[in-house]
Amino acid sequence: MSEMPKVRGRLTQARPLSDLTWLRVGGPADWLFQPADVEDLSDFLARLPEEVAVFPMGVGSNLIVRDGGLRCVVIRLGRGFNQIDISGTRVVAGAAALDAHVARKAADAGLDLTFLRTIPGSIGGAVRMNAGCYGSYTADVLVEVQVVSRTGEVTTLAARDLQLGYRHSTLAEGAVLTKAVFEAPRGDPETLHARMTDQLARRDATQPTKERSAGSTFRNPAGFSSTGRSDDVHDLKAWKVIDDAGMRGARRGGAQMSEMHSNFMVNTGRATAADLEGLGEEVRKKVYDSSGITLEWEIMRVGEKLSSD
């Protein structure tokens, strides 16, 4: 790979990534860059040879890095990008701010971003994937984002420019989202915190939160998140079609579809990325054979497989 530009942050060669993902799997990145701030990131990308690929990585909550690793520069934002500021009904959050922290701080100020409380990950990932639950989505409250392009240009994009859909945005490949601005509805702080406490209790009762998981494995075939309402039928939920295919609790190596929630894949202790991805593909095949439905991955899979996979 070409000679790397000088940086003020941290630039590490051949950095293993498994400890940076919630599933604790994956090979090394050629380089891992943790910029000090927006200027450091912009300058690095502007001087990085154009033939060098980059991969913006959040906190690794919805990600499988394959066992062969990534032949690129992985960019991971840290403390210089986790600020949360509130003015009136506007919440400005750095891309590295955790969704749960943003929800709690907004609630303290009497602002309702409670749907973010149980979403694993950081604001950058929430925007890029239009994360949502309980019938609310990031797109509902997003105003604009700050983005650093692959060529180092710092720009501001309106929410509409991202064309946010179900678990989808049109944010350019290699672009790094650094900050998001939300317009949040007002609410009573005590009521908002009580709602989040209830949401956490419901999540912990139905999802394997104490195991190594990456959140939902597949997108709902219905094309929307669970709302939690009594009229929200299950026929086109990913977990339901997985159950119908007999794949709840299915195993491959150290990977397992959770007994607690069949759309959650867990690392039982010694799974490889190949185990996890292979189990997911087996589930997809069984579901298709059972129902004719092709499940789409919600977990992102990146990198190279080992030759033995």
UniProtKB/Swiss-Prot annotation:
One of its GO terms (molecular function) is UDP-N-acetylmuramate dehydrogenase activity. Its cofactor is FAD. Keywords: Cell cycle, Cell division, Cell shape, Cell wall biogenesis/degradation, Cytoplasm, FAD, Flavoprotein, NADP, Oxidoreductase, Peptidoglycan synthesis. Residues 24-187 form the FAD-binding PCMH-type domain. It catalyses: UDP-N-acetyl-alpha-D-muramate + NADP(+) = UDP-N-acetyl-3-O-(1-carboxyvinyl)-alpha-D-glucosamine + NADPH + H(+). Residues 200-213 have a biased composition (Basic and acidic residues). GO terms for cellular component: cytosol. Residues 200-230 are annotated as: Disordered. GO terms for biological process: cell division; cell wall organization; peptidoglycan biosynthetic process; regulation of cell shape. The keyword Glycoprotein does not apply. Cell wall formation. This is UDP-N-acetylenolpyruvoylglucosamine reductase.
